[in-house]
A protein has these predicted regions:
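Short, acidic/polar
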Residues: 50
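Boundary at the C-terminal end of the N-terminal hydrophobic targeting segment
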Residues: 17-19
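Secreted glycan hydrolases and related glycan-binding modules that recognize and/or cleave
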Residues: 22-28, 197, 201-206
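N-terminal leader/linker segments that initiate helical-solenoid repeat arrays
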Residues: 21-43
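Sec-dependent N-terminal signal peptides
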Residues: 4-13
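Concave beta-strand-loop units of leucine-rich repeat
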Residues: 38-47, 58-71, 75, 81-93, ...
Length: 207
């Protein structure tokens, strides 16, 4: 029993040792929290500013939902090891803060209001991209992307026309719930049941 207790102390001590300190501004004061490799802010939070203590925080996953009070997302640019970014019900001007996140594998955006769409061709390691429920009308810019990107989810937007894909494009484009009528092209998926074509590892990012 004593040995087990010591092992537990060592385990939690290690977690604390490698935890990242994050300052969250709520109203007019900052509060400091510790996270390991995941930063999550859910609906109902009143955070208006986020700062990492380290210049290059070891955070691999960030989930932001309904951050109505948060306007500046530049803190994400310091996360050089970021692999997963999920943003739901958020307003942003642009996605320039992502340009330094070269390790990004998953970018899942839902109910986003923005003035400038992300250039997914910048992320050569990206495997799954989603921009859903965001009143998107044109999707031409998303057919130019890295070779590792195999799954592009553009469901439930206002797309009325689909671009012609390159002959060597093997990616799947999920376009169910749009204005466009189904076309006979294997890359475009109109089925509402995305799970039939999307690997399980990405299903957790479906809204």
């Amino acid at each position: 029993m004593k040995k087990y207790f010591i092992l537990c102390l060592l385990f939690f001590g290690t977690l604390s040792l490698y935890a990242e300190k994050v300052s969250l501004k709520v109203y007019n004061s900052f509060q400091i929290i510790e996270v390991n490799d995941v930063l999550f802010l859910g609906y109902g939070n009143r955070v208006s500013e986020i700062k990492f203590e380290n210049d290059v925080p070891n955070v691999s996953k960030i989930i932001l939902e309904g951050t109505a009070f948060l306007k500046d997302y530049s803190f994400i640019s310091s996360c050089k090891n970021l692999e997963v970014l999920v943003m739901n019900n958020i307003t942003v001007d642009n996605f320039d803060f992502l340009l330094s996140c070269k390790q990004l594998k998953v970018l899942a955006l839902d109910s986003i209001k923005c003035n400038q769409l992300p250039n997914i061709n910048e992320f050569k390691k990206l495997e799954y991209f989603a921009l859903t429920n965001s009143d998107l009308e044109l999707c031409d810019s998303f057919i130019n992307h890295g070779q590792k990107l195999k799954f592009i989810n553009l469901s439930y937007n206002k797309i009325s026309k689909l671009p012609k894909l390159n002959s060597d494009d093997n990616s799947l484009y999920f376009v169910n719930g749009n204005l466009v009528k189904p076309v006979e092209q294997k890359n475009y998926i109109f089925c509402d049941d995305i799970s039939k074509n999307l690997p399980k590892e990405f299903m957790e990012y479906i809204r």
